[in-house]
Amino acid sequence: MRQRSFVLALSLAGVVQSLSCGEGVVSVTNQSYQPRIVVSGLLIAGHPVEDIHVSRNFRLDENLNETPIFLTEAAVLLIDEDEAANYPLTFVDSPSFEKRGFAWRDDTPLAIRAGGTYSLEVRATVEGQELFTRATTTVPGAGFEIVDLTPERTEYRARDGAGNVIMPEVTIERSPGTTFYLLTAVPLDMSVDTFIYDNPFSDEDPRKIDLFDFNYEFEWIQNTPVGAGQSKMGLFWWDVWFYGRHEIVIYAVDANWAHFLQTFEEVQELDGNFHEPKFEFEGDGLGYFGSAIPDTTNIEILRSD
């Protein structure tokens, strides 16, 4: 996920204040600033616990060269609510922004279970204030999987006999109780030479293109039937920017992460007023702590003859 942009944008969330009604105008000041713990973390069923980002918000006039954003000294505790077990997490430094976070580094096995309930508690000192936040997630239940992708190899925006553009389609087996599914498309052969310049969605100059603006796309479906059964997801052509192989990952998503994704960029009401995204935290927290079950398939995009 675009973890870096989420962390930085979430850090700004505590310093934006709407002072207008109906006009769609935002006045950004430091008047409403209060220190907050900013969390961005996911538990993935069957995967290690890692990359739990814990940072802070900051004032707009803050010198970020002198103000550490990551709360490396925070006390971060993962709680397995079903087993009544506590797991203190350790900060792992890394040159990679995405990998700089808290993780489970003990020899004791820690397996995130489908259907399990977990809480995250964070205690940290920010600007002399003792802050605390807590969030709880229930991992989607077992049963989710990708059943089929059709076609697995296709020309870019291929057409059927009637001249209609064919959209690749993924069939999934749903996780009982889960109604939100996220599809991501990641190019595996990304380069200036494989970028699809002849597309109807943008006009890019090969000499100026920033490939990393196009290296990750996502779509979702929501409000699917609650019970077990199959649903279909389309891979839209505006999510495909390169010829070659693409990894398609679909996630069955818990309520916390779904609420964040649904509200993170939709913060303006029809009347022009603004609201915060939906943060499922108690206490002094912003951001998201959620969970998901992933499954993966691949598609190859061919050049037209």
Each model region followed by its residue ranges:
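Gram-negative bacterial Sec-dependent N-terminal signal peptides
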Residues: L8-V15
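C-terminal motif of bacterial Sec signal peptides marking the signal peptidase cleavage site
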Residues: Q17-S20
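Bacterial N-terminal signal peptides that target proteins for export
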Residues: M1-L8
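A sequence/structural signal for flexible, mid-protein segments enriched
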Residues: G22-D305
